[in-house]
Regions:
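Structured alpha/beta or helical-core interaction and ligand-binding surfaces enriched in interleaved
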Residues: 1-132
Length: 132
């Protein structure tokens, strides 16, 4: 699961050694520190419970382990704390991060456009959206 929010960018996966936990990875030290701080504030976790680990040989250099329950509570809090109508504007300000996030936005826009073309010509097996 990829998550982009004001705390940063995270990739969360089930911990390979303990399926009750989630390994949350980040590419930037600032992001994993923001997450660690948020977890400590919102979930009364001790420092050692949310201490980021530096893994220079890993695909993601920064990691921490939390229970699936705590990760779910964090995501729920992030959703409930939404107070903006444009994510890109809400995180604007760091040129390297702006560029990276715009790259993700652009890649997914291109993906959407290619799907739209396929749907127009009946070549997509993508189901119709369920809008209510």
């Amino acid at each position: 699961m990829w998550v982009f929010n004001r705390d940063g960018f995270f990739s969360a996966v089930e911990h390979r050694d303990d399926n009750s936990n989630v390994m949350v990875r980040a590419r930037a030290k600032e992001d994993i520190e923001n997450l660690s701080s948020a977890l400590q504030e919102n979930h009364q976790l001790l420092d050692e419970d949310t201490a980021p680990v530096y893994t220079p040989d890993g695909d993601y250099h920064y990691r921490l382990t939390v229970s699936k329950k705590v990760w779910g509570e964090y995501l729920n809090s992030a959703a409930n704390d939404l107070d903006y109508d444009n994510f890109k504007n809400s995180v604007h300000g760091q040129s390297d991060r702006d560029s990276a996030y715009m790259g993700v936005w652009s890649a997914m826009y291109a993906f959407q456009t290619s799907r739209d073309v396929n749907e127009t010509y009946g070549e997509s097996d993508c189901p119709e959206p369920n809008v209510k």
